[in-house]
Amino acid sequence: MNDQIPMTILGVEKLRKELEMLKTIKRPKIIKSIIEARQHGDLKENSEYHAAREEQGFCEGRIKEIELKLSKARIIDITKVKNNGVIIFGSTVTILNLTSNQEFTYRIVGDDESNFKRKLISINSPMSRGLVGKKVSDVATIKTPVGDVKYKILKIEYN
């Protein structure tokens, strides 16, 4: 079983920066909050202490999650991947909705990098699954909650 997680170079850097921030800034701040809260006496009814401990749990959980993802990361540099003119992980694709006649441009990225507002869609999304492997001028049928939607591939970029 392949448990590697595909990521772009930018995606890996983003996770590394978050991990560093959690370890060097957030974790020490939480520890300081716990120490200060302990000084307020009885821990059973000390809401500051319990809140800090809960925050510590979330922080440590996120650190472990990021470390695991980075250990399984398969970094894909789109500029060095043979693409054969088809949509692949990391490519930027411009598509035309054949029903509404609207154009959209998306980049296909890893799960942690996806951000629909920034037009970054996960490789595991229905849209990506329907687009991967297609060439310019192909029509992709994407299953959506409101039914099938057809998109024509207008442009593929590998940058």
From Swiss-Prot:
Keywords: DNA-binding, Transcription, Transcription regulation. GO terms for molecular function: DNA binding; RNA polymerase binding. Necessary for efficient RNA polymerase transcription elongation past template-encoded arresting sites. The arresting sites in DNA have the property of trapping a certain fraction of elongating RNA polymerases that pass through, resulting in locked ternary complexes. Cleavage of the nascent transcript by cleavage factors such as GreA or GreB allows the resumption of elongation from the new 3'terminus. GreA releases sequences of 2 to 3 nucleotides. HAMAP family: GreA_GreB. GO terms for biological process: DNA-templated transcription elongation; regulation of DNA-templated transcription elongation. Belongs to the GreA/GreB family. The keyword Transcription regulation applies. This is Transcription elongation factor GreA. It comes from the Bacteria. InterPro entries: GreA/GreB_C_sf, TF_GreA/GreB_CS, Tscrpt_elong_fac_GreA, Tscrpt_elong_fac_GreA/B, Tscrpt_elong_fac_GreA/B_C, Tscrpt_elong_fac_GreA/B_fam, Tscrpt_elong_fac_GreA/B_N, Tscrpt_elong_fac_GreA/B_N_sf. The gene is greA.
